[in-house]
Design a protein with these regions (language model features):
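Short, high-confidence coil segments that cap the C-terminus of an alpha-helix
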Residues: 54-56, 117-120, 273-275
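A conserved beta-strand-loop-helix scaffold within acyl/acetyltransferase catalytic domains
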Residues: 12-64, 71-81, 127-255
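Aromatic (often tryptophan-rich) hydrophobic motifs at membrane interfaces
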Residues: 60-68, 75, 80, 91, ...
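Active-site/acyl-donor-binding loops of N-acyltransferases
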Residues: 2-11, 75, 129-154, 276, ...
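Acyl/amide activation-and-transfer machinery of modular secondary-metabolite enzymes
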Residues: 87-95, 139-146
């Protein structure tokens, strides 16, 4: 998609345009009016991603001046995963959202043309539902989503027995919950948690920008014991959904089941806010987090991420289970926390 196409170009009677600063309200109005759009399609993600020095290529389709489809895209240069055009990096969902098949087709065509022009290794569309069935599909991830019952959360009756017993352990330990945590509190716990998993952490300013951009729809829950933080989660609220997105805990929290207690607390909080759908987030198959979410009574739903290969010869294997990343992950787990906090942001900003 050439740079001079800012004024728009026609594909199959649609006009595809590049997002400009004045388009945010139109873009978000389309998101609000389109059921298949997700929290990660909101326009605010563009400036947040650009805050990590990535170039965004947000596209939208219109017909007779009316927005009929959107496609958020960002270009990532990763020392691990190569040069990619992704919808949407740092987000679990993305891809085209369109009012009609023609608008979807012209946005996909425009994205593929842009990927070819940029000479990326590949274009990745993080679809939540099957799309682009003629493209290579990778089912590395699943998501876990479920409607919360109107009764049985507070008294644990709606919680599966194994998780219920864990929550009672937290209750008996007198764990406390706050839903007004600060980014500073969150970051101290979260950085330790992801270091223990062997993952570089995003910079603190990333989470600060999320809070500023989404306000009360971005909430930090803190679980403490006698004032000492044990677990935390940054959740996103969108329509009638809550996404528990960035979560972590310290090792000492395991003895009192702080993680289980925390997710139970967020379920209670969601119902207080009138939200009924709980999004537990994505997990890789055959992992501990996958099993954990199933034990809460959630069923896995495959995430059919679609790929258009440009310079790459095959769909990339970006799974941490890839032997190629094993030494890095194991080494990162052993880093002193101050070192992982200092180095992590320089690496994580390019992982996407």
């Amino acid at each position: 998609m050439p740079d001079h196409a800012n004024d728009g170009y026609s594909v199959n009677a649609c006009i595809v345009r590049r997002f400009e600063e004045g388009d945010a309200k139109r873009w978000d109005a389309f998101v609000a009016a389109t059921p298949q759009a997700t929290f990660f399609h909101l326009a605010a993600w563009r400036s947040i991603i650009e805050g990590l020095h990535h170039r965004c290529h947000y596209l939208y389709a219109e017909r007779q001046g009316v927005v009929t489809g959107i496609l958020p895209l960002a270009e990532i240069h990763s020392w691990l995963f190569g040069h990619a055009l992704i919808s949407t990096p740092f987000c679990v969902y993305g891809g085209v959202v369109a009012a009609d098949p023609e608008s979807e087709a012209c946005l996909v065509q425009a994205a593929a043309a842009l990927a070819d022009e940029l000479r990326v290794d590949y274009l990745e569309l993080r679809n939540r539902e099957p799309r682009q069935t003629d493209w290579p599909i990778k089912h590395l991830y699943v998501t876990f989503r479920k409607s919360l019952p109107s009764e049985g959360i507070d008294d644990l009756k709606a919680i599966p027995m194994k998780r219920r017993n864990k929550i009672r352990k937290g209750i008996n330990a007198s764990l406390e919950t706050r839903h007004d945590g600060s980014v500073a509190e969150f970051y101290r716990v979260y950085t330790e948690s992801v270091r223990n998993l062997g993952t570089p952490v995003l910079p603190r300013r990333w989470f600060e920008r999320l809070r500023r951009a989404f306000g009360t729809d971005c909430e930090i829950t803190m679980i403490t014991l006698q004032g000492r933080p044990l677990a935390t989660v940054m959740s996103f609220y969108f329509r009638d959904e809550v996404h528990t997105y960035y979560a972590g805990s310290v090792r000492s929290g395991r003895t009192v089941a702080a993680n289980d207690f925390m997710y139970w607390a967020v379920m209670q909080r969601a119902l207080e806010r009138g939200v009924r759908l709980f999004d537990f987030g994505r997990s890789k198959q055959d992992t501990g987090s996958y099993d954990f979410k199933e034990q809460w009574g959630f069923q896995p739903e495959p995430l059919p991420y679609a790929y258009h290969l440009v310079r790459a010869k095959e769909v990339p294997n970006v799974s941490p289970t890839n032997r190629k990343y094993h030494l890095f992950i194991e080494g990162w787990k052993r880093l002193p926390l101050p070192v992982s906090r200092a180095l992590g942001p320089f690496l994580a900003r390019n992982l996407g």
